[in-house]
Amino acid sequence: MIKFNTVNARSETVASAASYKAPWARGQRCIVPMEAFFEPNWETEKHVRRKFTRRDGEPIAVAGLWECWRGCGDQVIESYTLLTVNADDHPVMRRMHKPGQEKRMLALLDPAEYDQWLERPPADAFELLRQYPSELLLDEPAPKVAPEAPRSPEQLSLVDG
C-alpha cells in the first residue's frame, strides 16, 4: 500500500519497490492530467523555476499509479503517485535540478497511448514509460510564487466524483 508522501515514483523500480509493487501488479494505473509542470533550472547556479507545457496547448497526461488504503480511524484514502523516468540525456530535462543530481522527468503519455497504459498487462506497460520528445514540450521561465504549505494526506487524496 502507498501510505507515505510519495508524490513521484521511479519507473525503473516500480515493480519491486515496497510502496508500489502491489498496485503495479494489480494494474492500478492511472493518468494524471495537468496544464503544466514546473522544474528547477540551476544552470546559473541559482534556482530558476521553469514551466513546461505541451507545445500544441493540449493538457499534459502523466503516467501514474493509484491505491486505496485505510488511514486513521479506518478512513479510506485514495491516493496516487506520478511515475518518472531517467532524463540524464534528455535535451531539455538534463538542464533541470542541481548539478550532480540524477536528472528525472515525468513519464508523459500521448493521447493515443491512454487506453494502452490503462489496459495493458503490467509487464507490457513498461514500454510506455520513456522520455517525452523535447520538441513536443514548451519550456519557459515561470515567476516565483509564495511557498506552498506542507501537504497533508487530504491534499494528496483523490477527489470522489
Q: What does each of the following model-derived ranges do?
A:
Residues 1-161:
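A structured binding-face within diverse protein domains that lines the active/interaction site
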